[in-house]
């Protein structure tokens, strides 16, 4: 399939609706307009017209919008046909358009891809379109819109520009030693480099917040049977998401619930009680529980406060702790404070946090919510923030590593050539975010995840 073909796709979701939109982009868009509408609409004006088949029979009637390139979303000629949202009507109109020469169905994300290739959007802005559609909270939607409007790209471009100026100075001093620019010892380069590194750290912190808004946090509730895991899931979800009984082993499979804490998505997973089970179904559930635990961002180790006074997880259940990944964050939750009479609250016990609460009554659950938010470094003040993806975080981290290595070359070895190379690599990593330096394979993976009509 060629990028010079004219493409068409339904821009509205499949199924019945009040309005259905077909979008056409490419060189033959004007021919499509003449064939279906009998005329070329006035640019950027809404025309109410019949949509006709090859025999001149009216298939539907609705609004036609004409956006001649390059002043369009894709940078090409674009035609939008807004008719009634019946699947049969839209299918007939789509088939009519596809009978015309050099017109084909668009690939997923191809409209946004063409906007990127025609310099109407950079890559971060194009990704923000999909993120805006998929936003699961108001804050995520606002941050995605900020990214679409170029907030993230501007921050990245400022870093790239600063690195460019720094590289010019360093490489000029290397290429013209007779000018006696003592850039290595006068401290000017190191000062500028420190400034860029500080700015990069600030962008990384904002990107981390944006990633939390987009990706959320995966929290697994684990522990012995009847510790109150399902009750805690229900308390956090604010509804009866899981069945709760006094019978050990009631939960036999993984239960998932998605909530928000001040805008941050939280993926809570309730698991089967961990024990040596004789029942085959329960054993499968326990194995799935361990799979979820190993992939978690944090584990809530649920403890029945009526069965032990211990507060350190290694004392409560050493076998459980021995199997956990060493770097996995743990929060010990002593449940049933309404029975034991323990004081509600949170405290640090060695390397773990300990929370006392009652999942049944809900007392102390707000403390747990605050703890989860703080443990991920999430702040609810995201005014002017932007969304970020994992690849963005990786690119920012790689750029930071190159700057650290470059500074080491400057401070310890006075190696200007090596410093210049690290600056170049850092600039290249940042340019991958906006698509200034990006492989075709990466572009294919990004745009293939979009909707067909986007």
Curated annotation (Swiss-Prot):
State the UniProt keywords alphabetically.
Answer: Cytoplasm, GTP-binding, Hydrolase, Magnesium, Metal-binding, Nucleotide-binding, Potassium, tRNA processing
Q: Drop me one GO molecular function for this one.
A: metal ion binding
- One BP annotation, GO: tRNA wobble uridine modification
Highest taxon above the source species: Bacteria
The entry marks the following residues as binding Mg(2+), namely 230, 251
Sites binding K(+) sit at 226, 245, 247, 250
Binding of (6S)-5-formyl-5,6,7,8-tetrahydrofolate, residues: 23, 80, 120, 454
Q: Which residues bind GTP?
A: 226-231, 245-251, 270-273, 335-338, 358-360
Question: Per its UniProt record, what InterPro entries does this chain match?
Answer: G_TrmE, GTP-bd, GTP-bd_TrmE_N, GTPase_MnmE, MnmE_dom2, MnmE_helical, P-loop_NTPase, Small_GTP-bd
List, alphabetically, the GO terms of the cellular component aspect: cytosol
**Required cofactors, per record?**
K(+)
**Where, subcellularly, is it found?**
Cytoplasm
Q: Gene3D superfamilies from the entry?
A: P-loop containing nucleotide triphosphate hydrolases (3.40.50.300), Probable tRNA modification gtpase trme, domain 1 (3.30.1360.120), tRNA modification GTPase MnmE domain 2 (1.20.120.430)
Q: Give the cofactor note.
A: Binds 1 potassium ion per subunit.
In short, the EC number is: 3.6.-.-
Q: Mind telling me which PROSITE patterns this protein's record contains?
A: G_TRME
Q: Does the keyword Disulfide bond apply?
A: no
Give any Pfam family that matches. MMR_HSR1
Main localisation: cytoplasm
Answer yes or no on keyword GTP-binding: yes
Boundaries of each TrmE-type G domain copy?
216-377
Q: What does this protein do?
A: Exhibits a very high intrinsic GTPase hydrolysis rate. Involved in the addition of a carboxymethylaminomethyl (cmnm) group at the wobble position (U34) of certain tRNAs, forming tRNA-cmnm(5)s(2)U34.
Subunit details for this protein?
A: Homodimer. Heterotetramer of two MnmE and two MnmG subunits.
What family is this protein classified in? Answer: Belongs to the TRAFAC class TrmE-Era-EngA-EngB-Septin-like GTPase superfamily. TrmE GTPase family.
What's this protein's name?
tRNA modification GTPase MnmE
Native source organism of the sequence = Pectobacterium carotovorum subsp. carotovorum (strain PC1)
């Amino acid at each position: 399939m060629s990028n010079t073909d004219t493409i068409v796709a339904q821009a509205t979701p499949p199924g019945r609706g009040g309005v259905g939109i077909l979008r056409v982009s490419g060189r033959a868009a004007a021919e499509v307009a003449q064939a279906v509408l009998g005329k070329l609409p006035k640019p950027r004006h809404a025309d109410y017209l019949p949509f006709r088949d090859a025999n001149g029979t009216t298939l539907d009637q609705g609004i036609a919008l004409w956006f001649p390139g390059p002043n369009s979303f894709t940078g090409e000629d674009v035609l939008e046909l807004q008719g009634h949202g019946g699947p049969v009507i839209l299918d007939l109109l789509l088939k009519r358009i596809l009978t015309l020469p050099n017109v084909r169905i668009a690939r997923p994300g191809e409209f946004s891809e063409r906007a990127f290739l025609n310099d109407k959007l950079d890559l971060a802005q194009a990704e923000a379109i999909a993120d805006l559609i998929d936003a699961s909270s108001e804050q995520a939607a606002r941050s995605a819109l900020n990214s679409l409007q170029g907030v993230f790209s501007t921050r990245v471009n400022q870093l790239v520009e600063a690195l460019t100026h720094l590289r010019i100075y360093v490489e000029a001093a290397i290429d013209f030693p007779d000018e006696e620019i003592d850039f290595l010892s006068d401290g000017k380069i190191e000062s500028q480099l420190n400034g860029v590194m500080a700015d990069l750290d600030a962008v990384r912190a904002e990107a981390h917040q944006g990633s939390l808004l987009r990706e959320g946090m995966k929290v697994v509730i684990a522990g012995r049977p009847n510790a109150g895991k399902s009750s805690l899931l229900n308390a956090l979800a604010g509804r009866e998401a899981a069945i709760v009984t006094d019978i050990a082993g009631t939960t036999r499979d993984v239960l998932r619930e998605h909530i928000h804490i001040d805008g941050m998505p939280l993926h809570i997973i309730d698991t089967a009680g961990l024990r040596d089970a004789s029942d085959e179904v329960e054993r499968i559930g326990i194995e799935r529980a361990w799979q979820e635990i190993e992939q978690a961002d944090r584990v809530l180790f649920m403890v029945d406060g009526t069965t032990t006074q211990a507060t350190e997880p290694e004392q409560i259940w050493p076998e459980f702790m021995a199997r956990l990944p060493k770097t996995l964050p743990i929060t010990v939750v002593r449940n049933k404070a309404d029975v034991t009479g323990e004081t509600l609250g949170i405290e640090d016990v060695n390397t773990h946090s300990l929370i006392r609460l009652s999942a049944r009554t809900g007392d102390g659950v707000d403390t747990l919510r605050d703890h989860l938010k703080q443990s991920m470094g999430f702040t609810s003040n995201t005014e002017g923030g932007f969304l970020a993806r994992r690849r963005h975080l990786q690119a920012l981290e790689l750029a930071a590593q190159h700057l650290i290595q470059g500074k080491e070359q400057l401070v310890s070895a006075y190696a200007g050539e090596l410093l210049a190379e690290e600056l170049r690599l850092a600039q290249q990593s940042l340019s991958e975010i906006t698509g200034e330096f990006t492989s075709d394979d990466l572009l294919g993976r990004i745009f293939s995840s979009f909707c067909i009509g986007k």
